[in-house]
Structure formats: structure tokens, C-alpha cells
A protein has these predicted regions:
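A compositional/biophysical signature of low hydrophobicity enriched in polar/charged and small residues
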Residues: 1-115
Length: 115
């Protein structure tokens, strides 16, 4: 309870088997843009936030500007998501990689580094 009060534990969740809820396809979407204004980013972030299929969203260093992890039932569902995204936001390049097999997935964090 102290960990919750101290903000260490943010929330409690149930871990759901994605196959049991028809989300068998994981897609990693690398996005590059030539626009970096706050206004553009706000529109992009809003578009991504409106898509429940996007389960993670990161701003990256290196060649990729943003990385999304998307979970969908099939490739057609991803294609529909992709079309909705590019309809709302001007993107320079979108590269999608489909996960063939999940080797490791954990939400447990290494607590050895905690103060």
C-alpha cells in the first residue's frame, strides 16, 4: 500500500491473452516525419491516442522519429488502421514490421535499481 501511495505502483491490471480476444497480430510501426512543430505533434499524438489498437507509442532517437506497437486481429485490420492514421496526419514514411513470434513479454520491471 505504501508503494501505491508513493506512486511506485501506478495501477493494477489484468494481463489478457491477446489470442483469446482476437488480437493475434502484433505490428511494430516505424514512423518518420519531416515535420517537428508542436502543432503537428499534437495532431499526431491525438490521432494515435484515438486508436485503441496502438498499445505503445514512443518518440525515438536515430533514423526513426516514432515507434508504435499495434495489436490487431489480422493484416486487413492493420491496413484499416494505417489508412485512418495517414488520413489524419501527414507522415513522411511509415514502415511496418509484423511480429512472427513473441519470444518474451513482461510487465515486470527490474527493481534492483530502485533507491
Amino acid at each position: 500500500q505504501r508503494l501505491e501511495e508513493g506512486g511506485v505502483i501506478q495501477r493494477r491490471v489484468a494481463l489478457v491473452d491477446p489470442h483469446k480476444i482476437n488480437l493475434a497480430v502484433t505490428v511494430f510501426v516505424a514512423v518518420r516525419t519531416n515535420q517537428h512543430s508542436d502543432e503537428w505533434f499534437q495532431g499526431f499524438a491525438e490521432a494515435v491516442s484515438d486508436m485503441p489498437e496502438v498499445v505503445e507509442f514512443y518518440r525515438m532517437s536515430g533514423d526513426i522519429d516514432y515507434l508504435l506497437r499495434v495489436m490487431v486481429p489480422d493484416i486487413d485490420a492493420y491496413d484499416q488502421l494505417y489508412k485512418r492514421l495517414i488520413e489524419r496526419v501527414d507522415l513522411f514514411d511509415v514502415s511496418s514490421s509484423f511480429a512472427m513470434e513473441r519470444i518474451k513479454l513482461t510487465t515486470a520491471l527490474p527493481v534492483d535499481y530502485a533507491d
